[in-house]
Amino acid sequence: MQLHNLEYKKGSRNHKEKRVGRGHGSGLGKTSGRGQDGQKARKSGMVRLAFEGGQTPLYRRVPKVGFNNDRFANKYNVVTLISLVKYETKELTAEFMYVNKIAKNEDLPIKVIGNAVLPSGTVVSAHKFSKGALESISNSKAKAQILE
């Protein structure tokens, strides 16, 4: 392939713009492909999605279903053990996590999850621990301290 041999792909340049309302010879003259009269023939004539002509629409006839527990669920700052490994302190307290932006929201309690090997003798303080995190902490000879 050379520059003087370049060609457009067959059929890629043949699409012509529809020129509506420019005479009956174009195939889209007079009513411009919109049919005769009526709301849909007007410039802003389309009805909104789910409009049923004034009848109460289906989404309002069918009752609301289900329950969402978001308002009542206990929310936590989730901290992974891997994110704690890089800090070389012996005590990883909640205050330490808030100050170092490991846990973002100070209003929420901290939950430690995940599995990583901590230096032995490290004390991790949090409000809650996952089973895997507790197992990893005990396997690496560190301590988990549950806060109230």
Swiss-Prot record:
Region described as Disordered: spans on this chain: 1-42
Coiled coil start-end: none
Signal peptide from the UniProt entry: none
Gene Ontology CC annotation, any one: cytosolic large ribosomal subunit
Biased composition (Basic and acidic residues): 1-10
Gene Ontology biological process terms from the UniProt entry: translation
Biased amino acid composition, Basic residues: 11-22
Biased composition (Gly residues): 23-36
GO molecular function term, any single one: structural constituent of ribosome
Keywords: Ribonucleoprotein, Ribosomal protein, RNA-binding, rRNA-binding
Function text: Binds to the 23S rRNA.
Subunit annotation: Part of the 50S ribosomal subunit.
Family according to the record: Belongs to the universal ribosomal protein uL15 family.
Classification via HAMAP family: Ribosomal_uL15 (MF_01341)
Protein name, entry field: Large ribosomal subunit protein uL15
Native species: Ureaplasma urealyticum serovar 10 (strain ATCC 33699 / Western)
